[in-house]
Structures are given as C-alpha cells and as structure tokens.
Amino acid sequence: ATPSFEDVGDIDLATVLFKAEGIGDGISETLDNTTAFASFAMSKTNPNSKGMLGTTDSQTGYSVWLGVNTACPILPDSARIGFEWNKGSKYWRSMTYGEDTYAGSKIATRGQAWEVYRTQKLTNALSFGVSYVLMQYDYTGSNSFFGADGKPYDINSLEAKQNGAVEEARDIRAYMRYKF
C-alpha cells in the first residue's frame, strides 16, 4: 500500500519516568556521580473508519527504557559513559519522528535496542561523543507513520520477508555538541 498522510484517528500517550541522580549516597564517589533512569510508556490508538496500524480496532502498545550514566574509569576524568536498553511491543507508537539518524529512532523500536556511549566534556559548552546503537526488530513498522498500511507484522512472517523487512539496524557515530 502507498503511505498517506490522511486523518486515521487519534492516539493517547502516557509516560512514567523515574530518575535517580547519585545512586550511591556516600557508598563510593563513582555511585555518587551515577545517574540511573527507568521509563515506562504506553500508546493507545483510537482509529477512525480508515483504520490505524492495519485495523479499525483500538490497540495498546508499550515501551520500557532503562539507562545508566556514570563517570568513565578511563582518563580524562571529565568523561562519562552510558548504557541504555529499551523494548517496544507490537503496537508501540512513539512520537520520535524528528530522529536525525539514518537508522531511525531507537525509542520507536518494536523489539529491543541497546546503546553504549562515551561523552567527553571539552569546555563548559562543548563536548565530544561516540555512540553505538543496535536495534533488533520483532515487528515491522517501527519508524513508520500510522495509516491502515502501517500494520505491524512479525519480523519472521511471510509478509515481512516478502517486503524485505529490516530485521536489525546499527548506528555508529562520533559527534561534537555545543550547548548554548
């Protein structure tokens, strides 16, 4: 089917986020400077008669996102390292269409995604970073729009295979970031 930008209904989104900055409380300097987070998000479609995600029935999706960021044990001591993992269900819909990578949004993944990164602060406003993201899809359509043509198929299904569905994507990048 040809993707379209027609009105296909509404969507409800909800997110709960827990973030702890300094998880050691005096146990060690490393833990005192560690940030951890956990996020649970839900999307619920309310399609009109045109259908959304391949059906006119309402579908609920979810996403879990966990991460930790801490001081890098390798000098210089102003560097930080982080690890993040997220998992999205078959009907998960994110609002991350502004993603700026060729691989697409890891948060939109219907499956699992892992990211490891290192950020080096160069000045108060300038930093340098490297990251690696691996996305493994369980269902098709992770970064697509809604319409009836957006039905998610199991990645191992005949429909997915016939349409050349992407099973895995990687993003490796080095970047400079300036904070205004």
Where are each of the predicted segments found?
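Outer-membrane beta-barrel pore domains
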Residues: 1-180
